[in-house]
């Protein structure tokens, strides 16, 4: 019985020593993050789509903050994101490329459930977990969560996933208030 208590005491002492060493090492060798990279990453849409040429939003933010990468490469963020980045970094806004010049039409993935074999490759490819389903059962896309990054289309072995535009409703309609004519009527006061 005393051998068990000795083993428990030795393991407890070792865990305290190693825990202390790890705690010291984490403080001593801590890598300080660049605050500008954190701010850039907060502005980006976090769709992790890779359309900018980087594997996600964090590497792109690191490239913009530390390597002087152009701020107009985020296609999902569009002009709004580019203008916010320009204001943050105190640089001139850069014109978007020809393909990003117009506001991109929002598309979401759509799965033809009749042809879905339930292989789960699309679920594994989705960076935001917008696809639900089970193995060997049909899958479906949660359109409110889907960012339209198009990463789920290529892995599908049956080609049952396609990108479809989001239907325009009153909830997602973008009103162009600058084209609505406004006429100011002056009211005369009679005193």
Curated annotation (Swiss-Prot):
Gene Ontology molecular functions: 4 iron, 4 sulfur cluster binding; electron transfer activity; metal ion binding
PROSITE patterns in the record: 4FE4S, 4FE4S_FER_1, 4FE4S_FER_2
Residues holding [4Fe-4S] cluster 1: 49, 52, 57, 74
GO CC term (a single one): plasma membrane
4Fe-4S ferredoxin-type domain residues: 107-136, 137-166
Record-linked Pfam families: Fer4_21 (PF14697), FeS (PF04060)
EC assignment: 7.-.-.-
Cofactor note as given: Binds 3 [4Fe-4S] clusters.
Intracellular or extracellular location(s): Cell inner membrane
Spans annotated as Hydrophobic: 1-26
Binding site for [4Fe-4S] cluster 3: 126, 146, 149, 152
Binding-site residues for [4Fe-4S] cluster 2, renumbered to this chain: 116, 119, 122, 156
GO biological process, one term: electron transport chain
Presence of keyword Iron-sulfur: yes
Predominant cellular place of this UniProt entry's protein: membrane
Broadest EC class assigned to this enzyme: translocase
InterPro entries hit by this protein: 4Fe-4S_dom, 4Fe4S_Fe-S-bd, 4Fe4S_Fe_S_CS, Elect_transpt_cplx_RnfB/RsxB, RnfB/RsxB_Proteobac, RnfB_subfamily
Domain 4Fe-4S as annotated: residue spans: 32-91
Record-stated family: Belongs to the 4Fe4S bacterial-type ferredoxin family. RnfB subfamily.
Biological role stated in the UniProt entry: Part of a membrane-bound complex that couples electron transfer with translocation of ions across the membrane.
Subunit structure and binding partners: The complex is composed of six subunits: RnfA, RnfB, RnfC, RnfD, RnfE and RnfG.
Name of the protein in its database record: Ion-translocating oxidoreductase complex subunit B
């Amino acid at each position: 019985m005393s051998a068990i208590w000795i083993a428990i005491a030795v393991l407890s002492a070792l865990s305290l020593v190693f825990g202390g060493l790890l705690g010291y090492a984490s403080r001593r060798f801590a890598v300080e993050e660049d605050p500008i990279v954190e701010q850039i990453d907060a502005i980006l849409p976090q769709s992790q789509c890779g359309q900018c040429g980087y594997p996600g939003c964090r590497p792109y933010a690191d490239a913009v903050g530390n390597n002087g990468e152009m701020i107009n490469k985020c296609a999902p963020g569009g002009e709004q994101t580019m203008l916010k980045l320009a204001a943050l970094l105190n640089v001139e806004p850069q014109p978007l490329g020809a393909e990003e010049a117009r506001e991109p039409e929002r598309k979401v993935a759509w799965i033809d459930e009749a042809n879905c074999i339930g292989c789960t490759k699309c679920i594994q490819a989705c960076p935001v977990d917008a696809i639900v389903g089970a193995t060997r059962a049909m899958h479906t896309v949660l359109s409110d969560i889907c960012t339209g990054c198009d990463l789920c289309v290529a892995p599908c072995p049956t080609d049952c996933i396609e990108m479809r535009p989001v239907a325009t409703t009153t909830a997602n309609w973008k009103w162009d208030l600058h084209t609505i004519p406004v006429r100011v009527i002056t009211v005369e006061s009679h005193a």
